[in-house]
Amino acid sequence: MKIIVLFVFAVTAFIFKGNAQKIVPIESNGKKYEVLDMTGKGKIQWGGYEEIAGDAAKSETNGAANTIAIVAAVGENKGYEGKPYAAKLCSDAKDGGKDDWYLPSKEEADIIYTFKEKFNVEERGTIWTSTEANGTQAVTKYWYTGAHYNNQKVDEYHFVCLRKVQ
């Protein structure tokens, strides 16, 4: 009986550990952040084609506000069969016992890029930012050159989540 219990415990511990995402501390210009490396979850959509009201998700500096606006507008992504999307997964993340994760803005992605060797994005890969370009496109960060591009919101790319450390 003890052998079976130990085996079940070991399998459960392995599954739990396998689902945990890596948290990477970074610092830039005296500001401290934690990056939740979600690249292991594979590629995912930014969200549906809902244009976010006004300029609510167009900030190039405030990913937290963008994420709130995206999740409010896209909701459960019913227009795309309820597929998970980057901003929602960041908003719902509880990793490290924290609940203030968000999809980084364009400029916050630039900060993360300076630490790119710490993340599991393929050399010519791309990550989402929370900055909306227009109703059908959002800004992405190209990992190979560091350039930004506007891509279709329903395309699939890697993503990371960010939180500010007080």
Task: Cite the ranges covered by each PLM segment.
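Glycine-aromatic-enriched surface loops/turns that form tight recognition elements
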Residues: 16-101, 106-166
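Bacterial Sec-dependent N-terminal signal peptides
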Residues: 1-21
